[in-house]
Swiss-Prot record:
An annotated GO cellular component: small ribosomal subunit
Name this polypeptide is given: Small ribosomal subunit protein uS7
Gene3D superfamilies named in the record: Ribosomal protein S7 domain (1.10.455.10)
Function noted in UniProt: One of the primary rRNA binding proteins, it binds directly to 16S rRNA where it nucleates assembly of the head domain of the 30S subunit. Is located at the subunit interface close to the decoding center, probably blocks exit of the E-site tRNA.
Family to which the UniProt record says this protein belongs: Belongs to the universal ribosomal protein uS7 family.
Alphabetic keyword roster: Ribonucleoprotein, Ribosomal protein, RNA-binding, rRNA-binding, tRNA-binding
Membrane spanning stretches: none
Origin: domain of life: Bacteria
Gene Ontology process terms (BP): translation
GO MF annotations in UniProt: rRNA binding; structural constituent of ribosome; tRNA binding
Gene name of the encoded protein: rpsG
InterPro entries: Ribosomal_uS7, Ribosomal_uS7_bac/org-type, Ribosomal_uS7_CS, Ribosomal_uS7_dom, Ribosomal_uS7_dom_sf
Length: 156
């Protein structure tokens, strides 16, 4: 770990279509092997599917989904006296967003639809309705934090 100073965070450019930084972060999370144009087409086609299925603005559905997925608490390992404890901690705003995007893509990839566009659209719609794999992951994270509440005094 660096001792001198905190590393500066790199600022991403806003998405040209939706003019949103979180959309750019989602595209970067979807991207595999540096193929950004493929990731962009996947996302924009998924948003078109969302618009057809819900008759709502896809950016609004996506925003609700991210709010529903974002965790407030998580557990972090802390070594105290020779044993490791899972200590519940609050999650920073930046990490909330990062975890939400990561879980959204992870559980979209595990879905059974045919194309990635359909998988992503389905997961976003499910997350906005408080269903789906990403929501289940958040609930599991909360259960872990709740069951380890006794170790909260080890927080740093």
């Amino acid at each position: 770990m660096a001792r001198k100073r905190k590393t500066p965070t790199r600022d991403v450019l806003a998405d040209p279509v939706f003019n949103s930084k979180i959309i750019t972060k989602l595209i970067n999370t979807i991207m595999l092997d540096g193929k950004k144009s493929v990731a962009e087409s996947i996302l924009y086609n998924a948003f078109a599917i969302i618009k057809n299925k819900t008759n709502k603005e896809p950016i609004e559905v996506f925003t609700v989904a991210i709010e529903n997925i974002s965790p407030q608490l998580e557990v972090r390992s802390r070594r105290v006296g020779g044993s490791n404890y899972q200590v519940p901690c609050e999650v920073s705003a930046k990490r909330k967003q990062t975890l939400a995007l990561r879980w959204l893509i992870q559980y979209a990839r595990l879905r059974n639809e045919k194309t990635m566009e359909e998988k992503l659209a389905g997961e976003i719609i499910d997350a906005s309705n408080k269903m789906g794999g990403a929501i289940k992951k958040r609930e599991d994270t909360y259960k872990m934090a709740e069951s380890n509440k006794a170790f909260a005094h080890f927080r740093w």
